[in-house]
């Protein structure tokens, strides 16, 4: 289901970065787009979001999440919980196949259609087909270098694209906070 992308988020030193590759894969055999942007700034530029999964489903979830952010006046956790409640109980939305990584200056959250809203202990999170590779790389970089959040996201995505056939080297990164 989640083949075709890697999204990684890192929080470090007052900076939060989310990045993703640009590959869109049709089925398991055909790359149909190389330069997709799967990362967005939401809520007046104060929230970052990235998706893995079906593109149309993710756009539906982005729109719904943005509405929940407005309703909660930018409270990331409340908006995420409200999104999951709606996602799980609505007959149409329940069928959507995507995951979101969202972040503000304070936290990074994973939001899934199975009801999870998870905040990592270490300020590092990744999803998608190359997510495990990017997560391992980001954790190593955060523990053994002085790189910024943006640089860690970039480097971990580069490592993931060298390993995962569903991840490419067209990388988009957005940040909030920092210098």
Swiss-Prot record:
PROSITE patterns: PROTEASOME_BETA_2. It is found in: Cytoplasm. Na(+) binds at residues 164, 167. The active site is at 5. GO terms for cellular component: HslUV protease complex; proteasome core complex. One of its GO terms (molecular function) is threonine-type endopeptidase activity. Its EC number is 3.4.25.2. Belongs to the peptidase T1B family. HslV subfamily. PANTHER family: ATP-DEPENDENT PROTEASE SUBUNIT HSLV (PTHR32194:SF0), METALLOPROTEASE TLDD (PTHR32194). This is ATP-dependent protease subunit HslV. It comes from Carboxydothermus hydrogenoformans (strain ATCC BAA-161 / DSM 6008 / Z-2901). The lineage of its organism: Bacteria, Bacillati, Bacillota, Clostridia, Thermoanaerobacterales. The gene is hslV.
């Amino acid at each position: 289901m989640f083949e075709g992308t890697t999204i990684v988020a890192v929080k470090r030193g007052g900076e939060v970065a989310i990045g993703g590759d640009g590959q869109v894969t049709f089925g398991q055999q055909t790359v149909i787009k190389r330069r997709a942007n799967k990362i967005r700034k939401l809520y007046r530029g104060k929230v970052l979001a990235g998706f893995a999964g079906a593109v149309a489903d993710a756009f539906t979830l982005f729109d719904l999440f943005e509405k929940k952010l407005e309703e909660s006046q930018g409270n990331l956790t409340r908006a995420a919980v409200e999104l999951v409640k709606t996602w799980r109980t609505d007959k149409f939305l329940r069928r959507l196949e995507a995951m979101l990584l969202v972040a503000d200056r304070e936290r990074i959250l994973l939001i899934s259609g199975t009801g999870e809203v998870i905040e990592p202990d270490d300020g590092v999170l990744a999803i998608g087909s190359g997510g495990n590779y990017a997560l391992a790389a980001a954790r190593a970089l955060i523990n053994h270098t002085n790189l910024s959040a943006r640089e860690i996201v970039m480097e971990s995505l580069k490592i993931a694209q060298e390993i995962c056939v569903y991840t490419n080297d067209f990388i988009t990164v957005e940040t909030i906070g920092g210098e």
